[in-house]
């Protein structure tokens, strides 16, 4: 009986850890896509061309 409880507890623990890792990875992917969104909030009066240049530069920098 105790061994069944331990196995069940271990299974629930492993599943919850896997779910936490998946959630963390999804959050990081979203964060990576939104890295340059702060530029919109800075009131820098960037033209669309300048903003596109910065976004392309950031993508090249990541590679």
From Swiss-Prot:
Tissue specificity comment: Expressed by the venom gland.
Signal peptide: 1-20
GO CC entries: extracellular region
Predominant location: secreted
Cellular localization per UniProt: Secreted
This protein's UniProt keywords: Secreted, Signal
Top-level lineage group: Eukaryota
Family designation: Belongs to the non-disulfide-bridged peptide (NDBP) superfamily. Long chain multifunctional peptide (group 2) family.
Name of the protein this chain belongs to: Anionic peptide 10.1
Native species: Lychas mucronatus (Chinese swimming scorpion)
């Amino acid at each position: 009986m105790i061994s069944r409880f331990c196995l069940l507890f271990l299974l629930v623990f492993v599943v919850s850890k896997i779910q936490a890792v998946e959630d963390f990875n999804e959050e990081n992917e979203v964060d990576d896509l939104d890295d340059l969104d702060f530029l919109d909030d800075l009131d820098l009066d960037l033209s669309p061309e300048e903003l596109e240049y910065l976004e392309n530069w950031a993508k090249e920098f990541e590679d």
